[in-house]
Amino acid sequence: MGRTDFNPEWYGAQAKVLTSNEDQMVVDYGCNGRGIVKSYKLFDGIQLCFLDFETDESMKAQKFNPDIIQVTHCQTGRYECEFTNHTVAYLPKGYFSIAATAYLPASFSFPLGKYYGVSLVIDRQALSEETRRIMQTIPINLDKIGATLGLETRWYVSDTPPQLQHLFLELYTAVEAETTGYFKIKALELLYHMEQLTRVNGCD
């Protein structure tokens, strides 16, 4: 049985793998207090990560591949980011964000001392032809999502609409209860809604 890839550049030298198999991996982030990241490999280039933190530590952002899109939802706590231009943005409870490698924070923290959320991470350089074919049948244009939302120059943050709130709740409920196949279906559903968001923003 293979193992889900662990990229130390994404987590930092202090992180360590607790468990790993071909479908999922649990990583201890190595921060003060608690920092657990549970990731599911869904498709080549796409993974779903549940983040469970209880820490007052401010952490430097790690190095990521140059063409990543990340959809994040905050279920509990608050996620705060400082960017290289010293501006600060935060993701409060009940909100979601979409970010790209071109505009990622220099550091992040959890001002309330806790955070529980989920992130869908798309590494467009790692997408296989099979993954792209699956997306095209829906259709979902992953290249279009980043360009139309202006992710090269900003961090897109929004209150979560009811249909997305329901979807995120299903993801949280499914942890430890459902197989990776279930998360694949929900990831496609989430990406479908991101495609619709692109259209709403009038960028066709």
Segments the model singles out, each with a brief description of its role:
Residues 5, 50-60, 121-130:
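Short N-terminal signal/transit or membrane-insertion segments
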Residues 17-116:
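N-terminal functional module of multi-domain proteins
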Residues 82, 90-204:
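Alpha-helical bundle regulatory/interaction domains
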Residues 13, 17-18, 62, 76, ...:
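Residue-level detector of solvent-exposed, low-hydrophobicity positions
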Residues 1-24:
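Short Lys/Arg-enriched alpha/beta "domain-start" segment
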Residues 2-7, 47, 67, 160-167:
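Alpha-helical structural motif
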